[in-house]
């Protein structure tokens, strides 16, 4: 088996249907499998999957186990040499997996590959490529300084590359993360203690610590309907702060300046 596509679903039945249809089309010339994990949805996601896609492996959790654990369960059932963590509110292109697989085979030391993500209206989603959110980098993001001075404060969204350039980046978004299954298992998969918005940062960073290079690959485009960039409320800011706190406590030390930066950012937001 070449590729296992892991889709974790929670109450997005219509998006899920579109997503699975697009993945099936993209896998037509690939020895691949689709694994859908449902986190105890209250809509008819599972009924739809059984009716529309009876050959797709469906795992039904009896409780909502969250993003990290749900995906870890899915990967545990995968048999592909490569895996792709894919959000259910995405639509991949027909050429997505063929192109990403070809790129992966050329880059012997790749860790995780992400692709060009756009929203439902065709706008590029900047979280497609990011840098390690050091305290200052996180501050420039949370205050919006990166928008005012993108050349000076552009590290959060890896502005050393434009959206139409392929190259090395540090952090990729959990909506689309392509990697070898062996690497996923070596680093322990997603940390199940992670807060929302830190799980993909943590996994990307673990790949780097493992001596790998992460890549943004621009030559295929994936629609992500509910991207992080579309969320602009107080709840998002609180979760972002929690995510940064978790990441720094795990990998670095949380300094006084980090706490000040985060509090200032929330005030200015």
Name each model feature, range by range:
Residues 22, 38-47, 63:
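A conserved acidic beta->alpha catalytic loop
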Residues 91-127:
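Conserved donor NDP-sugar-binding/catalytic core segment of glycosyltransferases
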Residues 21-31:
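Short, acidic, metal-binding catalytic loop of nucleotide-sugar glycosyltransferases
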Residues 132-169:
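Short, flexible, basic/aromatic active-site loop/helix in glycosyltransferases
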Residues 83:
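Short aromatic/hydrophobic "clamp" motif used to bind/position activated sugar donors
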């Amino acid at each position: 088996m070449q590729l296992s596509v892991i889709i974790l679903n929670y109450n997005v039945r219509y998006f899920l249907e579109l997503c699975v249809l697009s993945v099936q089309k993209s896998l037509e010339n690939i020895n691949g499998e689709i694994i859908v994990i449902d986190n105890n949805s209250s809509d008819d996601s599972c009924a739809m999957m059984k009716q529309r896609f009876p050959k797709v492996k469906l795992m039904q959790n009896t409780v909502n186990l969250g993003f990290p654990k749900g995906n870890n369960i899915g990967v545990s059932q995968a048999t592909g040499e490569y895996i792709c963590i894919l959000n259910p509110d995405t639509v991949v292109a027909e050429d997505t997996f063929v192109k990403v697989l070809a790129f992966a085979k050329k880059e012997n030391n790749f860790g995780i590959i992400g692709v060009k993500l756009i929203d439902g209206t065709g706008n590029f989603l900047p979280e497609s490529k990011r840098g390690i959110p050091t305290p200052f980098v996180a501050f420039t993001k949370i205050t919006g300084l990166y928008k005012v001075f993108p050349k000076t404060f552009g590290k959060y969204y890896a502005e050393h590359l434009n959206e139409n350039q392929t190259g090395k980046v540090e952090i990729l978004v959990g909506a689309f993360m392509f990697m070898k299954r062996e690497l996923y298992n070596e680093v322990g998969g997603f940390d199940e203690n992670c807060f929302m918005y830190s799980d993909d940062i943590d996994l990307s960073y673990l790949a780097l610590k493992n001596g790998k290079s992460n890549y943004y690959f621009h030559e295929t485009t994936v629609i992500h309907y509910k991207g992080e960039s579309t969320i602009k409320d107080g709840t998002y800011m609180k979760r972002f702060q929690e995510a940064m706190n978790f990441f720094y406590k795990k990998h670095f030390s949380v300094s006084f300046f980090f706490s000040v930066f985060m509090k200032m950012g929330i005030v200015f937001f």
